[in-house]
C-alpha cells in the first residue's frame, strides 16, 4: 500500500506518525476498530496521506474513509487559499553554488582534454571521463538545489510541490533551477556537450536544438509504450484467465521461503499463510501452520530476529488447474482471505500489466557508469601504506585512464602515521581499486582506494570507437604498442595493438597522387614552390586517328578512332515521317534496308544494324506454317529474334483469319460452321476479310475467338475420305484424288469440317515461299588498325516461326526477315561501336553509313591546390587529325609543390606503389632555445612539459630532429593513445591526411542496465526469450580449472565434478570468465558474463537434480528454483522504477508458465512422446503405473513464455481467440478435442455465465448438499430424481413417493423396491440406499428427520401424499 516517493528523513518521520494519525470526526459512523485514534502532530506528505487513508480504510471501512478524504480535501484547499500558495518566476531560485560547481567541472574537463592531447589517455577514456564529470556535477547541483531551498526558502511553492509529492519530482525541479544536463542524440549516444543552463535562465540556440532531441524521444516513447503495455496485459490475461480460487485448502506441504532483506521483511509476508511453525531464535512459537500473517505479526516476526519464513504460495499450490484459498492468502482489495470463485488470474494479470505504462519513462541513460556505486576511501592521516601479507594485486587501468591496481583477494591495508596517532585500517575487498603502492608515503585526505560493492557482476559489452587523425603527416608507432597481424577465418589480415601505447602523427604536407602518377623527386631532397613532384601520363591502348572534342565539365575528351568501316555500296537516306526520322540504306539495285539505329548512337556486338525492307514474304492474314523437307533452322535459345535459316528451301503457308474477341455470346451474328463471304459482319463491328468456313470457340457464354478458313467446300458422303482428313487435316499433292470423283490440280490442304448443311471437305489454298540458301551481303570497305579490334557485318535470314506454328492474326505477318548484324571479334564485352553518317569521299552530297570503334580518353583540367592535393597542370601531347600508335602518350599531368620544404617518400613495394608523398615545411618544425645543455637525443619523442634541458620544459609535442648546445629542433607531432587489442588502420611510416581513421579502439563498457529494462525487459522475462549471446552456465557442481587454448585467445573452463567426470566449456572470444581457478561452482552458476537463458538454466537445474533425486522431486525442485528466479527478476524491474506489485500476482503468472512438462518417453502410459502436459497429470498417470507395475513416463520440465502458454492451454476456444485462430482450430478439429469450458474466456465466448463470483460452480454443489432431493420429482426421470436449479432448503422430504397411492415414510418393502426397480430400469445390484435415499455428507451421522407440516400439506394438495 505504501509507495516510496521521497526519501528524506522528514518524510520517514511523518510516515511513522501518519500510521495512526486519524482525527476522525465524531459524526462519522461507528468505528470498526475499538482502539481510539491517537493524536500526533506532524507534517503529512504524500506518503503520510497514503498511509493515513489506508489506515482509515482498514480500521473504519469505506464510508468513514471517503468522508475523511473529503474533509482532508477541504482542509487542503482552505489552507492553500489562506496561504496564497501560487507560483511565479521568482520562485525559481537558482542556487548560488551553481557557478562554482560548473567552474569546477570545466576545470576537470580542460585537464582531461589536455591529457588526451598529450596522448596519455585514449579517446574512449576521455569521453567516459567527460560524461562522468558532468553526471557527477549534475548530482551535486541537485544537492545544492535541495540545500538552497531547505535553508533559505522551505515554503517556496516549487519546493513544497516537489518535496511533498504533490506533483513533479527532483529531476524536474533540477531542470528548472539546476541544469538540464546531458542529452542523448537520436542514435541514443550521449552528446558530451551538456546543457549547462536551466529553464529559468533560458537555453542558448545550440542547447535548445540538442534539448529538443530528448523531448521528441519522450513523446514517441510514451505513444509506443501505451500500445506495448496494452498488449502485455492482453497476453497476461490470456495466460492466467482460468486461474480461479476453486478450493479451500489443497493440503500441500510444499512451500516457498521468504528471506528478510537487511533483517526486514517489509510487506513481503503480509497476507500470506505460514506453511509451518514460525519459531523465534529463542524457541518461542510465533505462529502455527496456516496462520494468516498481518502487519503486527510480520513486525513481531521481524523483532524476534527470524530471517526466513516458509509460507504457502500459488507457486506450490497443488489444487488442480486453480489455486486454493490458503495458498493464495489475502485478497489485497480488502485484506481478508480470498473468497472462493475469485478470478485471481485476471487480477494478477492486470496488476502486472497496468503499471506497464509507468515503466521505461526514463529510458535513456545519463552516460558512463556513475562511480557512485563504489565507495571511495580517503586517508585520514598522513603516513606510510602497508599491505597485509596475503595481499595480491594486479595493474589495472580505470575507465578514466588512471593507472591503479586491482585487488585479487580480500586483505587489509593500513596507513601507519608518521608521528603519533592511530593507524588507519581499511578493508580491501576482491575487485577493489587501489590508487597507492605498498610502502608509499602519502598525505592526509588522499584517495586511497575504491572499494568494490560486494561481488557485483556487471555485464559488459564490447564497443568500438574510431580514432580520427587531426593533422596530416606521417605515422610512427611507439615500441610499446607491439603490433601483430591477426588472420581471421576469411583470411583477412588485421593489425592489432598488443599493449597500451602511443601512435604519433608527425606533421607534414601530404599530397595525394592521382592514379598511375610516378614521383619525380627523390626522398629527402629540398623542393621549391611550383616544382614538379610527380607526373602522370595517359596513353592510347590501340592507337589510331585522333579527334579532339569540345570539353565537357571539368575535363576534355580525346577520341582515338581505332577501327572504322564504311558501307560503300549504300546511300544513306533520311525520311521524315510524322512519328520521327527514318533512315534507310539504298543499294545500287534499289533494294532498301531500314536502319535499326540512328546515326550518333552506339550499338554492341550481335545487334541488328539494318533490316531488308521486303514485301515478298508478307502474308495477307494469319495462318499455319509448314516447312517443306529440306528447309532447316538453327536452334535458338530464345525465339525473341526468330530462328536463323541454316539451309534454304520452300515454306508452305495455309492462310486462316483469326479474330480474338472475348465478348458476350449475344453479340455473335453468324453460326458455327457456316460459309460466309468476305466482308460479312461476324460479331457486332467486326468484319471478315476473307470468305470461308467459320469456326466459333466459346467458353462459359463468352466468345473467345472466331476462325475463318478460306478455300473450296465440297459436301461429301464418302466416309473413308471424311475420316482420312478428320482433325488437323493434311497436305495433298496435285493430281491426287481426294474423294470419289474429286481430284485437284494445285497443292491443297484438306480438312473435314461440319457445317449446318452437313459434313464435307474443305480444300484450303496453299501458298509457297521460296527461301534462298543465304542472304546476299552488300559490299563493304573498312579500315582496320594494325592491332585494333576487328569489325564485320554478316547478313542473316531469320524466320519468325517454327514448323507447324499457328499464327492467330487478322493482319498479315512477316515470315522472313533479312538482317545485317554487327560482328566484332577479339574484343572486350564493354566495347561499343558508334554509328556515324559520313559524306562520300568523291560525291560530297551523298552520305554513307560508317561504323567506328572509338577509344575515349578523358583529360583532366588544371586544378588549383587544396589541402590534400597539390595544384596540377595537364598538357595535351597530340593534335586533331594526327595518327598515333598504341602506347603513345596522349596527355601528361604534373603535380606541383605548394610550398617549399623537404620531400619525403614512403617506401614503395611491388604490391602497393607510392600513393602519397609528404613535404616537410618550415612551419612543421620549431626550434626551442634552452638555457643549458639539452638533455634530449635526436629521434626522441617529447610531449608538453617534458624537460628539454635543466629547467626548460617543452611547450609543444614532437620528435627531436636536431640538438645544438643551446637549442633543440622539434618536428611537431601529435600523440594518440591506443588501448590493447585495438585494430590499427595504418602501419608504421604510412602517410595520413587529416580526418583519416588511425585505429579502432575496442573497449568494454558496462551494459547500462537500462538498455533492456522497463517494458522490454518484463516482456523478455515473461515471454522466456532466449537472449542472443547468453552466458555459459555450469551444468553440474564441481571445481573449476581454467585452461588456455592452443591460440592465445581461446579459453576452456573445465569443471571437475563430484564423480571425477569432467565438463568442458569452451569460452568464445570476447567473453569474460566470471570464475577463478579452484573455485567451487554449483549447477546453473554463471561461468561467463552475459544474459541468462532461462530455458538453459532450467535444464541445468533439472539435469543436476535428476542424478540425485527421483524424477518427480527433481522436476519440482528445478521448477521451484527457476520460479523463484523469475519472480525476483520481474520484481527487480518494477522496483527499479518505483512500482510496487505484490509477489503473489507475479507468482500466479509464473505458475502458469512453469506448469507443463514435455514427455520424453511414454513408457506404458497412453501419453505421446513430445507432448506438453500438466505436471499434475503426469504425476497421476505415473502413480497409476506404479500400482499396475507398468513403466512410468519420463519427462523434462519446460518453461513456456506467456504467448506459448496461452496457445498451449487445454481450452482450444480460449487459445483460438488469442492468436493463430485457424491453426489452433484446425489442430483441435483433427485431434477431436473437447473443451470443458473451465476458464472465463471460453464461457464468455459461448455466452454462458462465467464460473467466477456468483457463477462459481462450487456454490451450486454446496446448495445441493444442503437441500437434498427436490420433491417435484417427475415420473419420467430415470435415475430417481432430477436435481433442479431452484433448490429450496426448506424441503426436508427424504423419500420419493411409493408406487401405490399411499406414501410410506419408513423403509419400503422388497416388493415395493422391486416394482420401482422394474419401473425405472434400475439394476437390482445397486444398493437400495444409493438408489432411493439422499447420500448424506457423512453416512454414519443420520440426521434426525422432522416432518415439516407445511411441506406435507403441500404434497397432499398436489395429490402426491394420501391424507393419512
Curated annotation (Swiss-Prot):
Is Secreted among the key words of this record? no
* Span list, region Disordered: 1-42
Where is Zn(2+) annotated to bind? 250, 317, 324, 327
Xref: Pfam families: RNA_pol_Rpb1_4, RNA_pol_Rpb1_5
Q: Which CDD domains match?
A: RNAP_beta'_C (cd02655)
InterPro entries from the entry?
DNA-dir_RpoC2_beta_pp, DNA-dir_RpoC_beta_prime, RNA_pol_Rpb1_3_sf, RNA_pol_Rpb1_4, RNA_pol_Rpb1_5, Rpb1_funnel_sf
UniProt cofactor(s): Zn(2+)
Q: How is the cofactor bound?
A: Binds 1 Zn(2+) ion per subunit.
Q: Give a GO cellular-component term.
A: DNA-directed RNA polymerase complex
Q: Give the GO molecular function terms.
A: DNA binding; DNA-directed RNA polymerase activity; zinc ion binding
Protein keywords: DNA-directed RNA polymerase, Metal-binding, Nucleotidyltransferase, Transcription, Transferase, Zinc
Q: Mind listing the GO biological process terms from this record?
A: DNA-templated transcription
Q: Which reaction does it catalyse?
A: RNA(n) + a ribonucleoside 5'-triphosphate = RNA(n+1) + diphosphate
EC id: 2.7.7.6
Q: How does it assemble?
A: In cyanobacteria the RNAP catalytic core is composed of 2 alpha, 1 beta, 1 beta', 1 gamma and 1 omega subunit. When a sigma factor is associated with the core the holoenzyme is formed, which can initiate transcription.
What role is this protein assigned?
DNA-dependent RNA polymerase catalyzes the transcription of DNA into RNA using the four ribonucleoside triphosphates as substrates.
- Give the family from UniProt: Belongs to the RNA polymerase beta' chain family. RpoC2 subfamily.
For this protein, the record's PANTHER family field holds: DNA-DIRECTED RNA POLYMERASE (PTHR19376)
Q: What is this protein called?
A: DNA-directed RNA polymerase subunit beta'
Organism, scientific name: Parasynechococcus marenigrum (strain WH8102)
